[in-house]
Amino acid sequence: MPEPIVSRDSAIAADEADPLAYARARFVLPDGIAYLDGNSLGALPVAVPAALDETATREWGRDLIASWNANGWWTLPARIGDRIGALVGAAPGQVMCGDSTSVQLFQAIVALARLNPGRGVIITDGGNFPTDQYIAESAARLLGMQLVRVSPPDLPRVLDANTALVAFSAVDYRTGELWDSRAITAAVHGSGALMMWDLAHAAGALPFELDGIGADAAVGCSYKYLNGGPGAPAWIYVAGRHQATVDLPLTGWQGHAAPFALEPGYAPAPGIERARIGTPPVLSMRALDAALDVFDGVALADVREKSLALTDMVMRYADAALPGVLAVTPRDPQRRGSQVALQMPNAYEVTQALIARGVVGDFRTPDLLRLGFAPLYLTYTQVWDAMETLHQVLGSGEWQNPAFAARAAVT
């Protein structure tokens, strides 16, 4: 890592030397907003509105149903899947784009359990994002298996010959802790179990090597660091070595070997095509396809280096200038994703006061202010100034305004 950033002057110097500075122009960024919530919803890429207009006006409006062939709608899920695959270390033909993360979690968990019959336990992280736990719980109930919840560091305590699969997230959604995916995957395989990773908080924010670590399956969303927009389709990775035998539970017509033969019985398509389910949301996929252009020419190593520098700067600032605030994100850069979680009393009210000042982060119950860092469109100076704003909000007590205590439906 470069020298720590400990002043506004050093933040300015870091911006002047930033190899990713050019990428900021690839986004629509509102004036006066420090957007530190890219770990929840990424900013709008400049190319997306034109892509949506083209798809709606010319393709849908003029070419109508011919667009499935003439404009490549049919091949979008696999083509976008390969583009995402390139960002998560997956060779072509192993990632399919479509549906929601919850759906893809169900697909992956049930499929891996079926690939490893005779074992009765599914393991997930008790601190995992709720949908990961809910889907794992439902899958276990459906399959007549036991669900065991355990934090990744405690995995060796429960991993045994009865474990069918382990389903963890690469980055903890609350604290931003990055788990050692290579070591965990190796331990899981050593017990004869299979490994699934949720990369929702990793894809696009840091280099990941699904093939390299030997993952069996993975899922992820595309509206965070991939900037695909609200409700953008998710994706699933199935390692090539499993594709001939994997039995995915949701056997929709588009995953059939011959979808337009309209046969009454299901015969899976070869390769990753069998991971298709139903008709893809073309408008959302076109938006995502255009959004992925922001990564053209970008080295994920540069993204990672800037992310670590930004998160380090924020934690150093919190330690030095924010009494009563605890950064619960790991200091070790090898254990940190692309966010910082600040634990404090009245975190919800503080978050709302920051938003009113143009600093957008988010709140996670019970007491965390999360700040997410998307290196492609944030500057060091912008983040430094955001921390100064947090210092002012806490020092002035303005967060005590009763208006900031009103809970909205989405926090």
Task: Give residue spans per PLM region.
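Pyridoxal 5′-phosphate
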Residues: M1-T411
